[in-house]
């Protein structure tokens, strides 16, 4: 447990009545500065908190260690989730660690093979349900009631408890100086909810002198929360057919939208809806600086640039962007298409090929 960046903050987590937490050494991930990406985005400073450095490659591990520990405390034997990939990988690993069985419901044809491979490797039962995350989640709720499954999606409050430690780490790594803005991608909005919970608790403890603004960036084709926030309406209108290649945020009915809205109200927050081209450009920019991430993560940085260009973020802003998933989570995205192709000319010699590449041909 001492190797866990989450359980270092055990005094701020629920009491597990003597149950040994289920941990894989999650947390404690790096937060490098990204000066070239900051210049590209138009802000004075940009650091990236890379939660893809967690054991299964995403931020989900921060919450899953707590949720699976609670399942053990309750004596549950089977855990389940609906997932576009990252939740399933994390749940399967932590369930395996705890000796529990796990069931994953996924939308048909909508999940990265790399993410499915993780869940399969860890021994989960994979079931297809519908064509969107929201279809799979609705089916999960029915099956959970019928079969007594312990659900570990972000509607589970224990997930939020673990994920709030991300903001604790961010502030700790900054010597408890709050940034002007924390940017993150928005899918089911559990992460935004968790950040808000962490900020409220830190402020109540007197550890936070001011609230950073929270920016939630969604893909334009899956942006119901952005539309609600921008329109000022009281209720979220679901997107029945969400579309984006950033599969981790391809969600049309985010379960945590009410909590996320309260977070934006608390922090004078912002939202952005970024195009596929903007996501791809941000991902390339990060990669050129040696920082790899999955497409959904890049949406956070794309949102910073978009709002800076619109004048909604000042040039002098000090920004932390949360990268939620590892580069290897969605290698199909890289291989299939967002980069200019440079097919080798089989008739040219190696020197000519190299010279042409160096010239950017």
Sequence positions of predicted segments:
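PLP-dependent amino-acid enzyme catalytic core
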Residues: 1-361
